[in-house]
Amino acid sequence: MQLKTFAVLFLIVLAACQSNESKTSTATGPMTINGAGATFPYPIYSKWFDEYQKAHPNVRINYQSIGSGGGIKQLTAQTVFFGASDGPMTDAQLQAAPGAILHFPTVLGGVVPVYNVTGVTQPLRFNGTVLADIYLGKITKWNDAAIANLNPGVKLPADDIAVVHRSDGSGTTYIFCDFLSKVSPDYKQKVGVATSVNWPAGVGAKGNEGVSGLVRQTPGAIGYVELIYALQNKMSYGSVQNKAGQFVTASLDSVTAAATGATMPDDFRVSITNADGANAYPIASFTWLLLYEHPKDAARGSAMVDFLKWALTDGQKFAPSLGYAPLPQPVVAKEMQALGKIQ
C-alpha cells in the first residue's frame, strides 16, 4: 500500500515538474518589446531590429511606423514601451507624460521637396520663401516668376501646383515647418511648427509612403518626404538654398554638414534646420528614440539600453546605404553616458 502511495506521489511530482518546465520554456522565449512612431526612420529601424535579433534571438523588437505624433501619444499612454519622433517633444508634452522621458538621437536625415512636373527632367531649385509661399497657397502655378527666377533655362509648364502634405502627426512635417518658419515670417505666423498643423492649402496623405504615392500619381504635385523615400521611389527632388545662399542637394555629406556646428544640449533636443555652413543641407534633422527614464519593466528597459548601445555603434554602419548619415562621434559619446540614467 505504501509503495502504491509513493508511486502516485511520484507521478504527481513528475507531472508538476514537467508543467513547470513547459512554463519556463515559454517564459524564456524571445522577449517582445513594442514601439511606435516616426515613419522618417522606419527603413533604418526595420534593418536594425532585424539585424539585432539575428545576434540576440532572445529579443524581438516590433515597431509601427504611425507617425511621430502617434508615437508620442502611445508612449505617453504607455501602450508601447518606446516611441520615436523626428521632432523633439515639447515641454508641455514632456510634462503631460506620467514619467520622465529621455531623447536619444539615432541617425541624421534630410527632408526633400519631391515633385511631379510634366516635361521637367532636370532637378529644380527651391528656396525657403518659395516653398513657404507654395504651402501657403500664394504660389499656385509651376511657371510662377518666383520659381522661374530660381531655375533659369528650365521650361516650366503653366500647370497648377497640387500641394501634398501629411495628414497624420508627423516629425517630417515638424522638420519641414521648422525650416520654413525660420525663413518665412508669414509662414511662422500662419502655420508655425508642430507635428500636426493647420494647412492653408493642399491635400493630406498618411506617412512618407502616402505622400510619395500621391505625388507620383498626381501630375503637377509637390510634397516633402525623407530622402530615402525619394530614392526608393525614384522620384524627382530639388535642391534647396541654404543659409549661406548655396543651393544644396540632400546627401550624406550635406546632412552631416548641417550637424557639424550644432551644440548638443544635455537633453538632446536640438534643431539643425537652416544651419550655418556653405555645404549644409537646410532641411536636415536628427531623429530620436524616446524612452522612459524609469521604465516599469526593468528587464525590457535593460534590453533597450543594450539595443541602443549596439545601434549607436555597430548599427551605424547600416545607415549610409539607406540614405541616413551616421551620428557624429561626440554625440554618440554623450548618449552612451546618458543611457546610464535608464534604470
Model-derived features: positions:
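Bacterial N-terminal signal peptides that target proteins for export
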Residues: 1-7
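C-terminal motif of bacterial Sec signal peptides marking the signal peptidase cleavage site
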Residues: 13-16
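Flexible loop/hinge segments at secondary-structure junctions
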Residues: 18-343
